[in-house]
Every structure is written in structure tokens, then in C-alpha cells.
Amino acid sequence: MMNEMLNWIETNPLSATWIGLFLFFVAVFVRDISQKKHTIQRNFPIVGRLRYFLEMIGPELRQYWVANDKEERPFDRTERSWIYATAKGQNNNFGFGTTEIQYEPGYPIIKHRAFPYPESKAYVHNGDPSCIPCLKIIGPKRKFPYRPYSIVNISAMSFGSLGKNAVLALNRGARDSGAYHNTGEGGLSHYHMEGADIVWQIGTGYFGARDHSGKFNLDVLKEKVGKNACVKMIEIKLSQGAKPGKGGILPAKKVNAEIAAIRHVEEGKDCISPNSHSEFTNVKELVQFIERIANGTGLPVGIKSAVGEIEFWQELAEEMKQTSQGPDFITIDGGEGGTGAAPLTYADHVSLPFKIGFQRVYTLFQKEGISERIVWIGSGKLGFPDRAVVAIAMGCDLINIAREAMLSIGCIQAQKCHTDHCPAGVATQNWWLQRGVDPELKGKRAAKYIQGFRKELLSLAHSCGYEHPGQFTGQDIEISMGMNRYQTLEGLLGYKRDEVKFTKLQDYTVFPKRQA
């Protein structure tokens, strides 16, 4: 009988196909109408499946066909296009005037000068017209002080959250552009060793600097820092803008032998970052921990935090004033930050936005008279020249970028970072998807983005009569308060940033060397 059926199928292929399709849809119909998990499928068998398919591809449909250039979040199409064009070395100019609503509340206007700084006089350091060194030395009293070559740098993103090719590309981009590369709390990996300056971030899990019980081990940290002269600073992560006050977990399926070895954790088990540090529980202990690491490694040590309660910052400023100890730099992460997967409420409602958070912390340290001795770093959607200028005018010495750097190496804002199914291969450990990121090519694009960013910052500074963007003040920015109402940034925020000593750009291109 089987032979007869096969012969019939062979002689009647079209009829067999239709019968096969009919039986397939009958099976799907029976399954849909009998299952209880999905209401729509149960009530509308077969047809109801279209809803879930359209829901699945909805973000892509909206991104490419539905949304206009200014609608999407967190980065709209115009912003992404600027990053992509800059990273590829293409024309990143826009024609036919602005599409922005310049009277919209909060809109910044940068005030140019009638007599700009002559670009013909601009100093070019070692053939790099985009060189913008930090005007301050970080940790001048430490054994190995550090002056960043670039005021635009790559923020904390861990290997584990990002794939190895993405980390390689970012590190090569940082190397070629002179930026530093923050490891993220996942610790220092060999993918960070492509030649860029490194900021080693230490989070609540103390990954890569812990013993077998999970406790922080200074000797392990000292040994690794001693062997790797590329490590220039240590950053203690208190919190991040995406999910402040909440820990994290790298699922067991992602914890392969390589990640386990880098983080000093067990392979095949969930890798947990607690929501609080075990090495300190108050401000005094935090300052002592900072000094312990700084004295042990000789490196500048700072902290990264989103801003919530202000009492912590007041106590920290007072402790630093009394003891002349504490962080050499402070990274303020705005609530706009978003490289970490987070519960929706945390992403939307926990921690203050950058401008408000930075203003509250900075003014506290000004009142205590110690703001000038700290290097201030801003992060949280600051990867565009206009936003960077505002942050600098508020008091930032450096800018850290994360998602914008991801976009420069191919991220398409699919917002699937938390699923391990990043279609661009950036935020995934899937070996097949990762192959889409070529470290050599994407590294060059990351470098071009950072260099293009800095060139535009320099151009804006020159237009406003300055040689270096660090000279911007709150008087150079006006903020729209509605129709026909503008106020200076300085007047709006209620403070004047510290004046940073500046002579000429060339004087700040001497960089202290650290040898292993």
C-alpha cells in the first residue's frame, strides 16, 4: 500500500501538494483551537497566528517604513544617520536647514562669536587634527597620574554583554583614535588588549579581581595591573543609569569556559552581580576602599554612579574635604543611560536625568570647595557634539559614550540586547550572529566616529572663539523656555562651572607614561 501511495504522489504531484497543505492546516487548526495559552489563536485558529508574526516584526516595520526621522527612541533616525555617516567617513552634513523646533522648551542654542578662533592657527598634534586632550591630569598625586588624549571616550560595556568581536572592534577603534576604553564590570579580558588605554571597572561582583569565594582580592588586581600597562585607571561602579540599585545576572548558558576564566566564576552557572558592594557599606568605608586600591596599584581611582538621593553626595564631599582623600574622578551617569538590560520601571523612572543629576552633585562639591580637584565625566546619551558642549559647559571634563559607540560598529537599535539575539552581532554571544561584526573594519569605523565627533567639537569651539571645547561656559549656551523665551544655561541651572586653567592646546599634549 505504501508503494501504491508513493507511486500516486509521483504521478500526481500537484494534487499531493494540495492534500499535504490541507492536512497541515487541519493539524494547525486542531492545535490552535485546543491550546489554552494564546487567546487570539484559540478564538481565531490559523489566522490568529498573523497577529504574533506582525507583532514580532513590528519594530522593524516601524523603523524602516512607518516612523519619521524624529519619532524613534532612544535614538531617532537622524541621530543614527549622523553616527553611521561619521563612522563610515561619509558626508554627515544635512541639507535644506534644520528640522528641529527651536522654540521647544529645553532646546539648546550655542552662541557663536563674531570673531571666531582662526582655524588656520589650530594646533595639530602628531598629524591628528582631532586631538582634544583633557585639560586636567587625573590623580596628580598618585604614582601613575593620567591625562587622557581624548575628551571623548568609550564607556563601560562588558565582554559577556557584548560579543568578543564587538569588544575587539571598540578597543581597536579606541586605540586608533586615542580614546580610552572602559571594560565594564565584567573585568579585563584579552579582547581589551588591542592597544587602547584601559579603564578597569570594578562592580559589585569584583569580576577578575576576586578570590574563589567571590571576595575582592587586591593582590589579584595588583598582579593584573602590574602585567598590563594599558590599564590607566580603576573605576568603582556604584550604579548605572539603566538600573541603579539593582544587580544583574549573566545566565548560565552564557557563562562559557572563557567568560568563567576572565571573571573568576564557575562555568555553566549563573554569574550574579549583587545590588550592593560587600567591601563597603558607608561613605567612610568607600573612601578607604578607594585609597586601598590607589595605594596598591598606583593608579587613579574613581567612581561611577547614577544620581538618586543627594545625602550620599553631600556626605562624600564632606569626607573628601576633611580627609583630602577619595575619588580622583567621578562619572555621573544620567537616567538616560541604557546599555544594561533593565526592568521597564528602572529604565524609565529610577535615577535623575543627566542634566539634573550632574547639576546637583557638582554644586555640592563646589560649595565644599573641592570640585576643581576632581575630573568630572558625563555619560548618558551624550554622544553628539551639541549634547557634549552642553555637558562641558556644565562642568564635565570628559564625555563617555556607549550606545553611540555600538551604533558606530553596526548596531541597528533592534533593542534585543537582553535576548542574546542581537541581529547585528554586537550584543550577543551567539557565534553565528557575532561573525557579522568584522573587528578590523568595525574598529576603523569606531575610530572615525570618535575622530569625527572630536573634529566637530573643535569646530564648534572655534566658532565660539575658543581653541579647546573645555573653555565653554554656561554663558555660551541658551536654553529655550518656550516661544520667545530663552535663558542662559548658567542662569537656568543656577551656578557657574569652575574655570579650568587654559594657556594653549599644545601645552596639554604632554601625557604621563606608565610602564608595567
Predicted features along the sequence, with ranges:
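Phosphate/diphosphate-binding loops
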Residues: 210-233, 237, 353, 363, ...
